[in-house]
Amino acid sequence: MSLSGMAIRRLITKGVIPVCQVAPLSTSAEGSTNLKEVLSKKIPAHNAKVKSFRTEHGSTVVQNVNIDMIYGGMRSMKGMVTETSVLDPEEGIRFRGYSIPECQKLLPKAKGGEEPLPEAIWWLLCTGDVPSEAQTAAITKEWNARADLPTHVVRMLDNFPDNLHPMAQFIAAIAALNNESKFAGAYARGVAKASYWEYAYEDSMDLLAKLPTVAAIIYRNLYRDGSAVSVIDPKKDWSANFSSMLGYDDPLFAELMRLYLVIHSDHEGGNVSAHTSHLVGSALSDPYLSFSAAMAGLAGPLHGLANQEVLVFLNKIVGEIGFNYTEEQLKEWVWKHLKSGQVVPGYGHAVLRKTDPRYECQREFALKHLPNDDLFKLVSTLYKITPGILLEQGKAKNPWPNVDSHSGVLLQYFGMTEMSFYTVLFGVSRALGCLSQLIWARGMGLPLERPKSHSTDGLIKLALAAKK
């Protein structure tokens, strides 16, 4: 008797089946290497499931919304459908049901590598299946073939002034790729709504193929005197080509990129960038415009600046007490920092109630490859002392480190010290999540998003009426 993928995942979670003993759970891993063909079978089956569910439970109430939720940025309000990932308060992000450690075990890796390939997480996010090596290689081959940038985008990037922020350049270049949109062309021709996802898929594959080149040109223009990016090597994977185009030929940096791009790829649908791409996409804007808008959201300091703020914090510590500190001296410094009304960046999370697994896998990478790096040792000591301090202070619901507490330190170690570029890296990664969500939104025929808004006076009337 065979177990379903979900049943096996539950057994993994409970420890009944060790992760390392589980073969890929994919129903498509033995089949086609054509992702679009696989999706053409999965989308109708999923839509039938949704139709049946809505027929039976369409009027079921799943949450009561209170006034604080409305004024509080709709935090924790159940109001979206996102199939690609779910954030568990205890286990962290799950990509199609798989935890970070499970993805690290199960997803295909580069030859000789230890970190999962972003091509594999893309297949997983799109299908819910762990891909085979052949399916992963097919994505690599397709992205390499689609990577060329149109001349007008290269010219635009080369003509941007040096003082234009890298995220502004990234956003503009993505939008400027829209003249190649297959989705926009298909809509103009009046194709059937049921086919929208196919053109969203084509645009998404094209955009993912081109993003590393866009990002690399921005980086080389701003920080490497405009030196030309290397050409795509068809023998290299997405991350290895990206690393080379940036100017980093250390194979270990490519491994870091694989890890970074996978763990930052998706985080449910309610964060600013994912929600923005969904909202703009719901108006049937093409994936280029939708993702460009998402990146404008990511550029906001409350969304995409966190790992830079951690580095500023670490450099402040080093500037005041150096690297030859004792644990007690560091405790005193953190307490002084908190008592001055400031926070410890990189600690706490809106949903998680334990150490972020994305932090833990970066820590494991550092312990293996850079255990004696001074900044990493500072991060490690902070990890040892800060949760206890925050618990004693009594203000933090979650005193544990999140993903942003570590990523900047790893990039610094390999020589990428240009902090203003870090959000662009984040954006390249987050494209995997935003665009897989967008394909499914069009495949499911999700409608234009249009929530009802109220004035404060209107809410007062509603609240008073509810109390009668």
Swiss-Prot record:
Where does the protein principally reside? mitochondrion
Q: Which domain of life, per UniProt?
A: Eukaryota
PROSITE patterns of this UniProt entry?
CITRATE_SYNTHASE (PS00480)
**Reactions it catalyzes:** oxaloacetate + acetyl-CoA + H2O = citrate + CoA + H(+)
Instruction: Check the record and name the InterPro entries matching this protein.
Output: Citrate_synth-like_lrg_a-sub (IPR016142), Citrate_synth-like_sm_a-sub (IPR016143), Citrate_synthase (IPR002020), Citrate_synthase_AS (IPR019810), Citrate_synthase_euk (IPR010109), Citrate_synthase_sf (IPR036969)
> What is its subcellular localisation?
Mitochondrion matrix
The alphabetized UniProt keywords are: Mitochondrion, Transferase, Transit peptide, Tricarboxylic acid cycle
Q: Which GO BP terms, alphabetically?
A: carbohydrate metabolic process; citrate metabolic process; tricarboxylic acid cycle
Question: EC number(s) on record?
Answer: 2.3.3.16
User: Member of which family?
Assistant: Belongs to the citrate synthase family.
Q: Know the name of this protein? A: Probable citrate synthase, mitochondrial
Q: Which organism is it from?
A: Caenorhabditis elegans
Q: What is the lineage of its organism?
A: Eukaryota, Metazoa, Ecdysozoa, Nematoda, Chromadorea
